[in-house]
A protein has these predicted regions:
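Enzymes that bind and transform nitrogen-containing heteroaromatic metabolites
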Residues: 1-123
């Protein structure tokens, strides 16, 4: 996740928001207040490539559009959750100039609340 996603939780006392997962925060100037959170101060693309070479499950990206845009070349699967209400505006999934990227719908689930979860894979 990016620093902008991580810091609001820290201000509320949540220093390890995903304690069941390996946690990484991309930031050039952050010192982690929690030993379970790793800070990536270098190139996030190279860090993700290194993580992808490690054994284990996938990588889940939580955060804003700038980090997602920088990592788009490394994103193999995109999971979008659509909620049945209109907010008016919000944070974009990808922020900045990105190359057109073709995806194929791999799965759709509709929850009892009416929310839908769409999973897309790279073509």
């Amino acid at each position: 996740m990016g620093r902008g996603t991580y810091e609001p939780g820290v201000r509320e006392g949540v220093t390890s928001p995903y304690s069941h997962l390996g946690q990484y925060v991309v930031s050039g100037g952050l010192t982690s207040p929690d030993p379970a959170v790793n800070v990536i101060s270098g190139d996030p693309v190279e860090a993700v490539r290194a993580l992808k070479r490690e054994p284990g499950g996938g990588i889940w990206l939580a955060g804003g559009g700038r980090l997602a845009a920088s990592l788009l070349p490394e994103i193999d699967e995109l999971v979008l959750k659509i909620y049945p209400f209109v907010l008016g505006k919000g944070i974009g999934v990808f922020d900045g100039d990105i190359a057109p990227t073709h995806l194929a719908l791999a799965d759709t689930r509709v929850l009892g609340s009416g929310a839908a979860i769409h999973t897309y894979a790279r073509k």
